[in-house]
Amino acid sequence: MALKQLSSNKCFGGLQKVFEHDSVELKCKMKFAIYLPPKAETGKCPALYWLSGLTCTEQNFITKSGYHQAASEHGLVVIAPDTSPRGCNIKGEDESWDFGTGAGFYLDATEDPWKTNYRMYSYVTEELPQLINANFPVDPQRMSIFGHSMGGHGALICTLKNPGKYKSVSAFAPICNPVLCPWGKKAFSGYLGTDESKWKAYDATHLVKSYPGSQLDILIDQGKDDQFLSDGQLLPDNFIAACTEKKIPVVFRSQEGYDHSYYFIATFITDHIRHHAKYLNA
C-alpha cells in the first residue's frame, strides 16, 4: 500500500514525519504522524500508538504534547493517527463537533450511513499496525497504546478487547463509561443503533468486567479542574470500581488544578512514556 510522505522534521535526533495513505477500512485518504527515534536508524524499535480526542487530527499530539524528548531517549516509535475518516460526503458528518468528522470514537459502526467508512476500531487495531509493521523499523511483538479523552476511551477498549496485543496502556482523562455519558450516548446511538446491549462492546467499564486476559497495569491521569469531569462525561470512578472488583491494578492520579487541555497532557507525558517504556523495553 503506497505511502505518501507529507512532512519530515528532525526532532531530538529523530524524525517526526506525517504520511498519507488510502485506507481499506475507512475507504478514504488518511493521514498519520510517526516519530522515528535515533535508535530506529540501526534496528527495530517498539511501537507506541497515541489516540487523540474529539475534534483532533494527527497534528494535535505532535505539536502540543512535547513527547519527543522522552520518546527519543527511550527509543520508541510513536504513531498518531487521525480521529475519524475524512471527506466521505456523508450527510450530517460535519454538523456537530462530537459526532462524525473528528469524532470516530474508535468503534466499527453498524448503522447506515456510517458503517461503510466509520471503522476506526479495525483501522487502529488491524490496518494501521499492519501498515506500520510493513513500512517502518518496528518490532511487531512490542506494541503499546495510550490516548486522551475520546482517545483514552479508544486506548482502553483496544487493550481490553485484545488481551495480550498491547504490552501496556495509559490514558489522560479518558471517557471511561460512554454508555452512561452524553457524548457516548450520542455517538453510540448514531454509529451502533438503539440496541444499548451493543454499546457495551465499546465501553471500558463493561469490558473490564469480563476481561479474561493477562495482567494489566493501567495508568490514568485526570485533571481535577477538568470541566468534562464535572459535566459527567468521563466517569472514571465507575471504571476504577470495575477494575477493583476484577483485581486489575490501576494507578489513577487525580491532578490538582489541571484541566482537559494539552497543557495538562504536556505536564505528565514523560511519566506516560516512561510507563510504556518499562514494558516495551523489558
From Swiss-Prot:
One of its GO terms (cellular component) is cytosol. SUPFAM superfamilies: alpha/beta-Hydrolases (SSF53474). It holds the Pfam family Esterase. The modification N6-succinyllysine is found at residue 4. Its EC number is 3.1.2.12. The modification N6-acetyllysine is found at residue 200. The modification N-acetylalanine is found at residue 2. It is found in: Cytoplasm; Cytoplasmic vesicle. It comes from the Eukaryota. GO terms for molecular function: carboxylic ester hydrolase activity; identical protein binding; S-formylglutathione hydrolase activity. The keyword Cytoplasm applies. Transmembrane segments: none annotated. The keyword Hydrolase applies. One of its GO terms (biological process) is formaldehyde catabolic process. It catalyses: S-formylglutathione + H2O = formate + glutathione + H(+). The active site is at residues 149, 226, 260. Serine hydrolase involved in the detoxification of formaldehyde. Homodimer. NCBIfam families: fghA_ester_D. This is S-formylglutathione hydrolase. It comes from Sus scrofa. The gene is ESD.
